[in-house]
C-alpha cells in the first residue's frame, strides 16, 4: 500500500544543540516519491531518501552531513512535505541551498520545495509537534493505472460511513503496541491520534 505523508514541525520550549562554528542550520521542506527507496533512513544495502539527500549536499559543498527529518517514512512511502534540517556553511543563502540541492538531486524523484534559516534550538525531529498521514485506497473493479504505486487498489466498494464510524475508536490516546514493527525505535507505544477522517475523494 502506498502512503502519502506530511511531517509538520513547530518550535517547542526545549532547545537542542545547534550547528558547529561556521555552519548554520537550514530548515527545508522536501517532497519525494518513495517507490524505489527503502525509506527515509540510510540502509547498508538499499537506496534511501536520507542517503540521496546527503550525497547531494556533499556534491554541492563538499561536506558529509547528517540530514535530520521530522519522521522516518518506510519503504515505498511518499512525502509531500517532509521537514528536514541540515547544518551547512553559513554563507549560503536559502535560495542558493534550494537551487543547488535540486540540481544535484536530479533525476531522483526528490525535490526541495522550500528552505529557510532555522530558529535557534530548532531540530526537525525533536521540535515536531505533530505528523499528518494520508492513505489512499482506490475502490473499483479496474486496477490502478495512472495512480499505480500511489494507491492501494481494492476491487470492491466500501461503506465509507461505517469506516468513519469505526475509525473514531482510534481517536485519542491509546497503546498502539499491536501496530508497531519489531524494529520500531519509538520510546513508547502510547500515542495520541488527534483526528482521523475517512472521505470519498470522488465518485
Give the role of each language-model region:
Residues 2-203:
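Structured-RNA-binding interfaces characteristic of tRNA pseudouridine synthases
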Amino acid at each position: 500500500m502506498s502512503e502519502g505523508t506530511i511531517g509538520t514541525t513547530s518550535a517547542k520550549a526545549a532547545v537542542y544543540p545547534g550547528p558547529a562554528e561556521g555552519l548554520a542550520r537550514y530548515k527545508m521542506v522536501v517532497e519525494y516519491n518513495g517507490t524505489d527507496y527503502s525509506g527515509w533512513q540510510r540502509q547498508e544495502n538499499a537506496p534511501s531518501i536520507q542517503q540521496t539527500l546527503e550525497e547531494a549536499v556533499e556534491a554541492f559543498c563538499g561536506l558529509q552531513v547528517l540530514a535530520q527529518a521530522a519522521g522516518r517514512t518506510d519503504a515505498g512511502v511518499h512525502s509531500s512535505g517532509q521537514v528536514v534540517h541540515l547544518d551547512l556553511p553559513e554563507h549560503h543563502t536559502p535560495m542558493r541551498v534550494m537551487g543547488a540541492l535540486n540540481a544535484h538531486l536530479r533525476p531522483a524523484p526528490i525535490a526541495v520545495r522550500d528552505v529557510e534559516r532555522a530558529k535557534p534550538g530548532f531540530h526537525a525531529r525533536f521540535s515536531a509537534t505533530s505528523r499528518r498521514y494520508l492513505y489512499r485506497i482506490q475502490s473499483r473493479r479496474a486496477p490502478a493505472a495512472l495512480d499505480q504505486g500511489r494507491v492501494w487498489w481494492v476491487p470492491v466498494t466500501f461503506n465509507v460511513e461505517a469506516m468513519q464510524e469505526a475509525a473514531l475508536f482510534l481517536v485519542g490516546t491509546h497503546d498502539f503496541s499491536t501496530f508497531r514493527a519489531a524494529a520500531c525505535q519509538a520510546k513508547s507505544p502510547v500515542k495520541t491520534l488527534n483526528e482521523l477522517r475517512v472521505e470519498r475523494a470522488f465518485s
